[in-house]
């Protein structure tokens, strides 16, 4: 199984950018069943938070609903994932908490890789990042 980082969804939904079309194509391949991938509950929370913070709630609602349509099964973040994230934060200075949580879930659940544009994942042992 492959984990999809929030930035893939945000680029696909966002304004023109070099990462937009590769993100759209990846999500289309996932939606068609060509690639088996999922997201976690933190990804959905990040979508809600970001669009509310930038006062674009109507867009945020649509992006959230599309994510739920593409990813009907969402992995729940547990206290154990948070415990693992805390350990990663101890081990990697400069690592952001949300990235640590995604990485911890990926490692704990033995995911194959994470699709992301965030190079911070490259520093973490046990995490394989793939850029679309």
Spans of model-derived segments:
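Short, well-structured N-terminal submotif of metal-dependent ribonuclease cores
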Residues: 1-39, 52-62
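Histidine- and aromatic-rich ligand-binding microenvironments
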Residues: 5, 39-40, 95-96, 118, ...
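Active-site phosphate/pyrophosphate-handling residues
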Residues: 7, 42, 100-104
């Amino acid at each position: 199984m492959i984990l999809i980082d929030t930035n893939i969804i945000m680029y696909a939904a966002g304004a023109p950018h070099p990462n937009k079309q590769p993100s759209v194509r990846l999500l289309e391949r996932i939606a068609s069943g060509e690639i088996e991938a999922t997201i976690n509950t933190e990804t959905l929370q990040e979508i809600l938070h970001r669009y509310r913070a930038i006062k674009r709630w109507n867009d945020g609602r649509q992006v959230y609903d599309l994510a739920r349509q593409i990813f009907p099964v969402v992995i729940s973040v547990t206290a154990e994932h948070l415990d693992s994230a805390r350990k990663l934060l101890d081990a990697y200075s400069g690592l952001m908490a949300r990235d640590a949580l995604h990485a911890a879930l990926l490692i704990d659940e033995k995911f194959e890789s994470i699709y992301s544009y965030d190079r911070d994942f490259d520093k973490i042992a046990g995490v394989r990042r793939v850029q679309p």
